[in-house]
A protein has these predicted regions:
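C-terminal, active-site-flanking charged/polar segments
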Residues: 265-279, 283-284, 354-364
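Active-site rim elements
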Residues: 2, 181-182, 250, 259-263, ...
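C-terminal regulatory/interaction regions
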Residues: 391-394
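Alpha-helical bilayer-embedded segments of polytopic membrane proteins, i.e.
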Residues: 59-108, 135-139, 187-202, 225-277
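Histidine-anchored, small-residue-rich loop motif
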Residues: 1-42, 72, 76
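Membrane-embedded catalytic scaffold of the fatty acid hydroxylase/desaturase
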Residues: 99-226, 289, 293-389
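Membrane-interface, cytosolic juxtamembrane amphipathic helix immediately N-terminal to a transmembrane helix
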Residues: 44-66
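Short, charged cytosolic
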Residues: 27-49, 199-216
Length: 394
C-alpha cells in the first residue's frame, strides 16, 4: 500500500478537493513522511493568495504551446537537413543533428513535463495529447513509464533509496547514496558518469519495454497499466523506428554510415541534455537523502514531505531567462516539486514566495548562481560517493 494522501494539496493548490479519512493502514509498501507542521499549509496559502491577486491561471496552456511552436519548426527543419531532404554540406548536417537532439528534448522539458503533472490546461484529453505526442510519438519513449517513474515514484519519494526510481539499484555503475555498497570502480565515476549520461535517451526506450511492459515494474514501483501494452510497444515504437530509421535508410537512400553517425550525434545530444539537467537538481553535495527505517510503521522518514522536497533539491540560474527556457524551468526544481500541478512558467514569480516561507520556518533553500556551479556540485557528490573506504550506511 502506498500513502499518497499528502499529495492532494500539491495537485489542488486552491483546495477544491476535500480529503476524507476512511481508515488507517497497518503497514505501507514504501516509507511514510511526518505530518505537515504548518510549513506546507502556509506555502499553499501564500501561493493561492498570489493567484487570487494576479488573476493568473496556474495552468495556462498558452505559455508552453506558444514557446514550442518555433521549437517544433526547428525540429522539422533540422530533421530534413539531417536526412538530406534539404541539401546541405556535411558540417551543416552535423550541426543539424545537434540541433535535432536538443529539439527532441525541449518539448519534453516543457509541454510533456507539464502534461504529466496536469499543469498545461484543464483538460485530461489535452494532457494525453501533449504528453503522448512529444514523448511517445516524437521521442519513441513511454508516457506510461514516465508517469510511474517520475510522477508516482520520484515526486513522492524524492532521493529515498529503495523507493525513488531515479536512484540506482544494486549492480549499477553509479553510486549516489551511502547505502549503496562501495566498489572500486566508483572512485572513477566522477569522470565516466558524465560521459555515460549521453546514453540516457537510448536507454529509456529499452527500459520501458524490458521492465515496464515485460516485468510490470519501473524500478521499485509496480506498474498499473492504463492502456494496451501491445499498442504502446508496436504502434509507438514502430512509428518512431519508421521515421527515424526505416525511412532514411530504405526510402531516402541515406548511406548507412552517414545515417548512423548523425543518429548517434542526435541521440547523444538528447541524452546529455536530459541527464545533465536532471542530475544536477537532486544529486548534489548540497542535497539531502532521507534514510528510511524499515521497522517503523508510521512516520518512517524523519521529515515531512514538503520539507523533504526543499532539502532534496537544488535550484540555479534564477536570473538567466535563457537557462530557464533551455532546461524547462528545472532550475526551479524545489518550486516544481512543491507545486507540480502549476505551470512551470509561473515558477520565477513563485520562487521568492517559497524562499520567504522557507526562511521563516528555518528550512534551507539552496540556489546556485549558474548551471555550471550546480554541475560542479554534482561532480563533487560523485567524487565523494566514489571515495575508497566509504561504508554503506544501513
Amino acid at each position: 500500500m502506498r500513502n499518497l494522501a499528502v499529495h492532494f494539496a500539491s495537485y489542488d493548490v486552491k483546495a477544491r478537493i476535500f480529503v476524507l479519512q476512511i481508515g488507517i493502514a497497518d503497514d505501507h509498501e514504501f516509507p511514510t513522511y511526518q505530518k505537515d507542521d504548518g510549513f506546507y499549509q502556509e506555502l499553499c496559502d501564500r501561493v493561492k493568495e498570489y493567484f487570487d491577486e494576479t488573476g493568473e491561471d496556474p495552468k495556462d496552456w498558452r505559455y508552453g504551446v506558444m514557446r514550442m511552436i518555433p521549437v517544433f519548426a526547428l525540429y522539422a527543419i533540422s530533421y530534413c537537413l539531417v536526412q538530406g531532404l534539404i541539401p546541405a554540406s556535411w558540417p551543416v548536417r552535423v550541426a543539424a543533428a545537434v540541433v535535432f537532439g536538443v529539439c527532441q528534448v525541449l518539448p519534453l522539458l516543457h509541454v510533456m513535463h507539464d502534461a504529466s503533472h496536469t499543469a498545461i490546461g484543464h483538460s485530461e484529453s489535452g494532457y494525453k495529447f501533449w504528453g503522448q505526442l512529444t514523448l511517445d510519438w516524437m521521442a519513441g519513449a513511454s508516457m506510461l513509464s514516465w508517469h510511474h517513474q517520475h510522477t508516482i515514484g520520484h515526486h513522492v519519494y524524492t532521493n529515498v533509496y529503495g523507493a525513488d526510481p531515479d536512484l540506482p539499484a544494486g549492480g549499477e555503475p553509479r553510486r549516489f547514496v551511502e547505502r549503496q555498497k562501495w566498489a572500486s570502480i566508483y572512485q572513477w565515476q566522477w569522470l565516466y558518469m558524465p560521459v555515460l549520461y549521453g546514453l540516457l535517451a537510448i536507454k529509456v526506450r529499452f527500459d520501458d519495454v524490458l521492465f515496464v511492459w515485460l516485468q510490470g515494474m519501473d524500478g521499485p514501483i509496480r506498474v498499473n497499466y492504463y492502456d494496451s501494452p501491445l499498442f504502446r510497444v508496436f504502434a509507438v515504437k514502430g512509428g518512431w523506428i519508421t521515421y527515424r530509421i526505416l525511412l532514411p535508410l530504405m526510402m531516402w537512400g541515406v548511406p548507412f554510415k552517414t545515417w548512423l553517425a548523425l543518429f548517434i550525434i542526435s541521440e547523444l545530444m538528447s541524452g546529455y541534455w536530459l541527464a545533465w539537467n536532471f542530475e544536477v537538481s537532486h544529486i548534489s553535495e548540497h542535497t539531502f537523502f532521507p534514510t528510511m527505517h524499515k521497522a517503523a510503521k508510521d512516520g518512517e522518514l524523519p521529515i515531512s514531505w514538503a520539507k523533504a522536497q526543499v532539502l532534496t533539491g537544488v535550484e540555479y540560474g534564477h536570473q538567466n531567462k535563457l537557462t530557464t527556457f533551455m532546461c524547462g524551468a528545472l532550475n526551479y526544481q524545489i518550486v516544481h516539486h512543491l507545486f507540480p500541478s502549476i505551470s512551470q512558467y509561473h515558477y520565477p514569480a513563485l520562487a521568492p514566495i517559497v524562499m520567504e516561507v522557507c526562511e521563516k520556518h528555518n528550512v534551507p533553500f539552496r540556489v546556485e548562481p549558474s548551471f555550471a556551479a550546480a554541475f560542479k556540485a554534482h561532480l563533487k557528490h560523485l567524487y565523494n560517493m566514489g571515495r575508497k573506504g566509504q561504508a554503506a550506511s544501513l
